């Protein structure tokens, strides 16, 4: 009887944990999440959220499911020396727990829109 209860509990836990979903997209200023999807976590994996910053300015976020090939490893202030970007990665294991990321920086949105307007004027001449 105990073995049957243990087996039932194990199957139930596997079924519940197998249905955990994560957000999956690249979030950029002004546009928000690009190609928003949902991914299903594999057993033993976690949702990942990586935020990239240039100095203190948020540049983009990458939301995804961890995989056996790329398991979630929390890291703070990892720097890419070539690009000068700083990355912060967080992990979580609840349904849709990796949020869509920080709000866009207003100054960056203004720079982006001004650049688009300038490009449009240049193309018209």
Swiss-Prot record:
Entry's Gene Ontology molecular function annotations: identical protein binding
Keyword Disulfide bond included in the entry's annotation: yes
Tissue specificity: Highly expressed at the leading edges of cells, on filopodia.
Disulfide topology: 22-47, 25-33, 39-65, 92-97
Entry keywords, A to Z: Cell membrane, Disulfide bond, Glycoprotein, GPI-anchor, Lipoprotein, Membrane, Signal
A GO cellular component annotation in the UniProt record: extracellular region
Protein name: Lymphocyte antigen 6 complex locus protein G6c
Annotated organism of origin: Homo sapiens
């Amino acid at each position: 009887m105990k073995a049957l209860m243990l087996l039932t509990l194990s199957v139930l836990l596997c079924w519940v944990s197998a249905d955990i979903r994560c957000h999956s997209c690249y979030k950029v200023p002004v546009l928000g999440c690009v190609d928003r999807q949902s991914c299903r976590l594999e057993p033993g994996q976690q949702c990942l959220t990586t935020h990239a910053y240039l100095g203190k300015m948020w540049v983009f976020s990458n939301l995804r499911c961890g995989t056996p090939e790329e398991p979630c490893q929390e890291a703070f202030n990892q720097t890419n020396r070539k690009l000068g970007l700083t990355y912060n990665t967080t992990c979580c294991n609840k349904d849709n727990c990796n949020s869509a990321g920080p709000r866009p920086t207003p100054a960056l949105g203004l720079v982006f829109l001004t650049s688009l307007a300038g490009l449009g004027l240049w193309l018209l001449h």
